[in-house]
Regions:
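Conserved HGGG/HGGXW glycine-rich cap/lid loop of the alpha/beta-hydrolase fold
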Residues: 5-58
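Alpha/beta-hydrolase fold catalytic core
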Residues: 1-17, 38-41, 78, 83, ...
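Gly/Ala-rich beta-loop-alpha elbow adjacent to hydrolase catalytic centers
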Residues: 89-93, 97
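Conserved alpha/beta-hydrolase catalytic His-Asp/Glu region
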Residues: 122-124, 141-196
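Catalytic active-site module of serine/aspartate enzymes centered on a nucleophile-bearing elbow/loop
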Residues: 225-262
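Conserved loop-alpha-helix segment in the C-terminal half of the alpha/beta-hydrolase fold
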Residues: 201-235, 241
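Flexible "cap/lid" loop of the alpha/beta hydrolase fold
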Residues: 102, 108-138
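Active-site loop/oxyanion-hole signature of alpha/beta-hydrolase fold enzymes
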Residues: 34, 43-88, 249
């Protein structure tokens, strides 16, 4: 089972499950925990190969797709007897949340999609294919640093960029390559998500400087009736770290509005 931690305020409060992105860990939510615990029970999960989810079992697994990763998260919920939860995700974690909800809509109360990845633009696709071709030649941290700079290029993004680089150093190289290959092949799944409304209350929280992903999210929100968009000014990709107070306020307000059926 994946490594996880729970923060239970009251048994009758709804749950919020946080899902980090590739190369991160549950520690990236340190600016959210105090605020969310006031109104919710909180579950933090380390995805396979990340944080403390590094048992040899995960190293040996050949099968690597978003459904398998989602099932591992659901295994934690089942273990804790959590029937329904709100989800909060960042970056590639939003793909996992959306995939879980697609197959198990009855488990989801609502979704907060921070720095959501729902389409790789042409530049992103070229970069991912180039990286996939070079991943067996270059040290994985060289690739990770490169992509961190591409996605978070400004000086104001340095805290988030440095945190993700620091967390990525803790990954096994084989694990990084598996995730990289997974992301390089994700476009068909993302296309399905863009053209199919989840019919679950969804709030996208994006930075105005998230040049690679914000344009596609604007189009999705215009098309999906269940989705809303909150753009944080002067903010990059990792919104929960760069502008935590704005992120927390917007997310908590939205979650409270959709907690009646918890």
């Amino acid at each position: 089972m994946l490594s996880y931690s729970t923060h239970i305020t009251h048994p009758n409060l709804p749950w919020v499950t946080f899902v980090h992105g590739a190369g991160g860990s549950s520690t990236i939510w340190y600016k959210q925990l105090r605020a969310f615990r006031k109104s919710f029970n909180v579950l933090l999960v380390d995805l396979r190969g990340h944080g403390k989810s590094k048992a040899p079992f995960y190293e040996k697994l050949k099968n690597y797709n978003f459904s398998t990763i989602g099932d591992e998260v659901l295994e934690v919920l089942d273990h804790l007897k959590i029937q329904r939860t709100h989800w909060v995700g960042i970056s590639l974690g939003t793909i996992i949340i959306r995939e879980i909800t697609e197959r198990n809509p009855h488990r989801t109360l609502s979704m907060i999609m921070g720095g959501a990845v729902m389409k790789l633009n042409k530049r992103g696709q070229v970069l991912m294919r180039t990286g996939a071709a070079l991943k067996s030649v270059l040290p994985y941290m060289v690739l990770y640093r490169f992509f961190a700079w591409i996605i978070m290029p400004r000086k104001t993004h340095h805290e988030a960029r440095n945190l993700f680089i620091l967390e990525a150093r803790k990954l096994y190289q084989r694990e990084f390559k598996r995730w990289f290959t997974l992301v390089a092949e994700v476009n068909p799944l993302l296309k399905y998500f863009r053209f199919n409304d989840s019919n679950v209350p969804t709030l996208y929280i994006m930075g105005s400087q998230d040049h690679m992903f914000l344009p596609s999210i604007r189009k999705i929100v215009a098309f999906h009736q269940s989705a809303l968009l909150h753009v944080i000014e002067n903010c990059g990709h990792v919104v929960n770290i760069e502008q935590p107070e704005v992120f927390n306020n917007a997310a908590i307000k939205f979650l409270k509005q959709h907690s009646n059926n918890a």
